[in-house]
UniProtKB/Swiss-Prot annotation:
The keyword Cell inner membrane does not apply. It comes from the Eukaryota. This is F-box protein At3g62230. Keywords: Nucleus, Ubl conjugation pathway. Pathway: Protein modification; protein ubiquitination. It comes from Arabidopsis thaliana (Mouse-ear cress). The F-box is necessary for the interaction with ASK proteins. SUPFAM superfamilies: F-box domain (SSF81383), RNI-like (SSF52047). The lineage of its organism: Eukaryota, Viridiplantae, Streptophyta, Embryophyta, Tracheophyta. It is found in: Nucleus.
Length: 461
């Protein structure tokens, strides 16, 4: 069949079917169909998925004045487009526009349009590329665009993503159908009031937000499967989590207390990263051990150097009071002596471990941190762990440099890993051949270590 015949067949379809077809295209592709004919020009204005992304529509000039007029023309185009929309329900609406505070009237019109069409999936990104920390956005909060009154009356939402605007969580009247929420660069006071009205919530992702008012997530939200906090600040002292079906939990930021009233016994992944901390906090040991104990069932567990260092302040710095179910353990590390107790603690607490990954990260000095062990003798102790005897098959080192402490840890694992099949060493990115010479030599040394397993293969990538 030639292309002309295909076009003829498509032209025989009803407008209803053609709208369904273009609604499965990207918005940019849907707009391109308007060039086919007058009929298509009208049909493309009925697509059910609308996406206005400034990076796809405009190539901005270097001059700030020229950029302003380009953005003004873009907002006028978007408003004109929705004013000429001839369709019915809108399934999804996306708006990505930086420096939007000068165009609040136009942005408000676009939001009200989406609300009027009973949008199910709403994504508003009004953030600035230059923002790096919460404070960057918080200082500009009075100038951020405020969501219109009509927004708080919407009842059709299934997905809500809001970046860089003023939003009052407690005022959203009927979010009972919402399954996914993602907030970034927003003050989130009284978030608990919103979550208490979302019984179908499955995913909650919060990044770079401040004044988060979240005292608890209760069993009312027992469908919640994924919970992520990244570089946020909380107004509460702690948050209680009753999340019996949680699959993924990730936290990045300063030490914060989560009390788990319940957690899934079949978790997929847990991630704990306190690298924003710069001071050694002895009292954080209890928080860390409580978190680890609550996440015992996680099949994949990732922790940062700060956690490895603070483990020695746990009530029992040898092992958790119950075994972890972890199969893959990812340790972000500098291989410093003050992390050794934490590394051994995690090995000792993971009797079913199959893959151990070390990811080298840049050093971040922790004030008042003093190693409590002799680094020269620590890995020479004749102490093995259950996982080394029965389950550990693979060890990975990402950004392998071949430092003294790296080699000591690897020598220990190879000497006692009875089931070990692979040790994969990945070279650092961006080094030239001269810089790689000593690293290759160190990798060769690893291949010569005395191995307990007869099937071990050491590979340098």
């Amino acid at each position: 069949m030639d292309s002309g015949s295909a076009v003829d067949i498509i032209s025989t379809l009803s407008d209803f079917l053609l709208v369904l077809i273009i609604s499965n295209l990207s918005f940019k592709e849907a707009l391109s169909t308007s060039r086919l004919s007058t009929r298509w020009r009208h049909i493309c204005r009925e697509t059910r998925n609308i996406s206005f992304r400034e990076d796809e529509i405009v190539t901005f000039a270097d001059d700030s004045v020229a950029r302003y007029y380009q953005r003004a023309a873009l907002v006028a185009y978007m408003v004109g487009w929705v004013n000429n929309f001839t369709g019915g329900v809108v399934e999804s609406f996306e708006l990505r526009l930086s420096n939007s505070y000068a165009f609040e009237e136009g942005v408000t019109t676009l939001i009200e349009f989406a609300v009027s069409k009973n949008v199910k999936h709403l994504f508003l990104d009004l953030s600035e590329p230059r923002w790096v920390t919460n404070n960057d956005a918080a200082q500009l909060e009075p100038g951020l665009i405020k969501l219109p009154e009509s927004f708080y009356k919407i009842t059709s939402l299934v997905t809500l993503k809001l970046f860089g605007c003023r939003f009052e969580p407690s005022r959203l009247a009927k979010p009972g159908m919402v399954k996914t929420m993602f907030f970034r660069w927003i003050r989130l006071e009284m978030l608990s009031a919103l979550i208490a009205k979302t019984p179908l919530l499955e995913i909650l992702n919060i990044k770079n937000c401040w004044e988060i008012g979240l005292d608890a997530i209760t069993g009312y939200n027992d469908r919640l499967m994924k919970l992520v906090f990244k570089y946020c600040s909380f107004s509460a002292q702690q948050t209680t989590l009753d999340v019996p079906n949680i699959q993924i939990f990730k936290y990045f930021g300063k030490v914060y207390r989560f009390e788990f009233a319940s957690a899934n016994k079949l978790m997929e992944e847990a991630y704990l990263d306190y690298r924003e901390e710069s001071r050694y906090n002895v009292s954080a040991g209890a928080i860390i051990s409580g978190f680890l104990y609550s996440m015992l069932s996680a099949k994949t567990f990732t922790i940062c150097p700060y956690v490895l260092q603070l483990i020695q302040e746990c009530e029992d710095p040898v092992r958790l009071k119950a075994p972890m179910e972890t199969r893959q353990l990812v340790l972000k590390t500098n291989f410093e002596p003050n992390e050794f107790v934490g590394i051994r603690f995690m090995l000792n607490s993971s009797p079913y471990l199959e893959t151990l990954s070390f990811q080298m990260v840049g050093p971040r000095p922790i004030e008042e941190m003093v190693p409590q062990i002799d680094p020269e003798a620590y890995w020479g102790q004749n102490t093995s762990h259950e996982c080394l005897k029965k389950t550990l098959k693979k060890v990975e080192v990402w950004s392998f440099y071949g430092g003294t402490h790296e080699l000591r840890v690897l020598e220990y694992l190879i000497r006692y890993g009875r089931m070990l099949e692979r040790v994969d060493l990945y070279q650092p990115i961006g080094l030239d051949d001269i810089q790689l010479l000593p690293i290759r030599a160190a990798a060769d040394r690893v291949g010569e270590f005395e191995a307990r397993s007869e099937n071990l293969v050491v590979t340098f990538y």
